[in-house]
Amino acid sequence: LNCTETSFMTGDLRLRAVEHFYDFHPISAQQIFDAVAARGIAREHITEEVLQRHDQDHYGGTAAVDRLMGEAGVTAADRVLDICSGLGGPARYLAWKAGCQVTGLDLTASRVEGATALTEAAGLADMVQFRQGNALALPFADAAFTLAISQEAFAHIPDKPALVAGIARVLQPGGRLVFSDILSRERLGADDARRLFDGMRFSEIATEADYRGWLHAAGMHVVSATDLSEEWTRILVERHAMYRSLREQTVARLGLEHFERYDQAYEHFVGLYRSGVLAGALFHVRRNG
C-alpha cells in the first residue's frame, strides 16, 4: 500500500497500511529465533534473559522499559494492558521482572503470532497473553486494567481522541497510563507528513499540547511528561546504522526494493529528529476518580 494522497485516506485505510507495514517489518519473530540460534542457544533453552538482547523493538531497550516501570510503579498486583504490543518484548519483561499479568493487543496478526511463539519459548505464557485487535475499539470490559502502557506506537494511530477515550474506559479509576510517543514540536508540513506516512506509517503525529488536551477531555490528567528528544535522536541514528547492517538478511527476505525504500524513509525520519522538527516524550497519566 503506497498511498501518496494521504490526506484523503480514511482511518480504516491508514490502519490497513500500518498492518501491512508490520507484516513486512525487518524485525520478526523468525529473525529473533535465528539470532538466538546464531548464539548457539537451542530453542528449548530460550529464557526471557536470552530474548532481551533481541526482542525490545522500541527506543532504548530494557533501560527504557525500566524507566517506564519506575514511572508507573508496577507491582505484581497490576493488571497491565500493552497497547500495540508488537512482538511482546516489553510485555514479557514486565511480567518477568514484576510478576504481573500482562495482556498485549496488536493490530497485526503476524505480530500476535510471533509474540505468542516467543512468549511460549520463554516459558511465560501463563503470565502474558496476546490478542489481535484495534486500539480504537479496545475489546475489553470497563475498568479491566490498573495500568496501560505503550511505546512509540500511538504515532501510527489516527483519531487519537478516540484512542485515549478508549484507554480511559478500560482503566479502573485512579489507573495509570504510561506511554512514550513520537511528537512534533509544531504542526508538520504537508510534505513531511506525507513522507512519514508513506515511509513509516506514522499517522497524524501529535504535539505535547495535543495530548494534554485529549487526555483532559477523556477524564485523565498528566502527572509528568519527560522530554526524550535528545536521547532518541542518538538512538535513531544507531538504529538506522543497525538496519543498514542487516542489508543482506533484509534483501534475502524482502527484496532490494523494500530495503532501499525503508532505508530512504528512515533517513528522512532521522533527519527530522536531527533538525529538531520531531521530538519525543514519556507521559505518566492518571485516570481521574
Question: Which residue ranges define each predicted feature?
Answer:
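Conserved Class I S-adenosyl-L-methionine
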Residues: 226-289
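A short glycine-rich, Lys/Arg-flanked "PGG" loop and its adjoining helix->strand segment in the class I
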Residues: 161-176
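Short, glycine-/aromatic-enriched active-site segment of Class I SAM-dependent methyltransferases
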Residues: 182-202
